[in-house]
Amino acid sequence: MSMDSSEMTTDLTAALEPLAATPVLLVALDFDGTLAPLIDEPMAARALPASKEAIASLAALPDTVVAFVSGRMLADLRVIGEHRDDSPIYLAGSHGAEFWYPTGAAANHVHGGDTDTDDVDADALRADADLIVADIEGAWIEHKALGFALHSRMSTAEDAARATREIDALVVERAPGWRRRTGQDILEFSSSHAGKDVAIAALREETGATAVFFAGDDVTDEDAIAHLSDGDLGVRVGPGESSARLRVADAQELAGVLSTLARMRAARRE
């Protein structure tokens, strides 16, 4: 059951204590709306200073792995995450279809999810999607490695509905096997059927994590939250239906939770 902010504050220490004590902890975090506020220009998104500080503290601890798990394609996630080649932070892009590990090798493939690419000219499909939204004010198409996304954050409700109808019709006709996802002012289609649950499972196996902390703010994050194990902890950032055990109001409040987790885990290792 989700909790409101007051309940979360009361029970925070109790919720974090098992994670602070676990032998190997994976801290997996969505990026947009979770570490960084949602903004109109997606490539300008950056994690809040408090988020960066908490992440650095966690990543510096022994037996503690930090990962960004995002719907962004891997290349874009590295840009907004200010991610260098020597970074200790793991990445899962495209909802778990692309990976980057600290060895520096990008695992640019679907990790456990099916794909549907037969008879689909993805480049032509993206180009036609661009044409559809060209005369719809505020709507635009984000090209992704395994598909595309319709953004309507800056559109009126009427224009957003029109763009959604026309893009849906295009994909039904041309790529009916592609996975459809909805989020906050976004409609995404992908040839990969992988979800963030797949990403968490892959990262858990890769890192040998004995417990997982996962936080996210959108519908696609619920794939991961719903598949967490009993010893894990899911946190929902902001409003919306969720199966997360805890809820925080926004990215700033989550940064405080991450900082608390870092302090508690560091104390366990003194």
Regions flagged by a language model, labelled:
Residues 29-32, 95-96, 151-153:
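Short loop/turn segments at strand-loop or loop-helix junctions that form parts
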Residues 46-141:
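Active-site phosphate-binding/coordination module
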Residues 1-31, 35-39, 50, 82, ...:
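Non-catalytic pre-domain segments flanking phosphatase-related domains
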Residues 2-9, 22, 112, 197-270:
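Mg2+-dependent phosphoryl-transfer enzymes with acidic/Ser/Thr/Gly-rich catalytic loops
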Residues 34, 74, 220:
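Conserved Rossmann-like nucleotide-cofactor binding loop
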Residues 136, 142-213, 219-228, 232, ...:
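Conserved acidic, metal-coordinating active-site core of Asp-based
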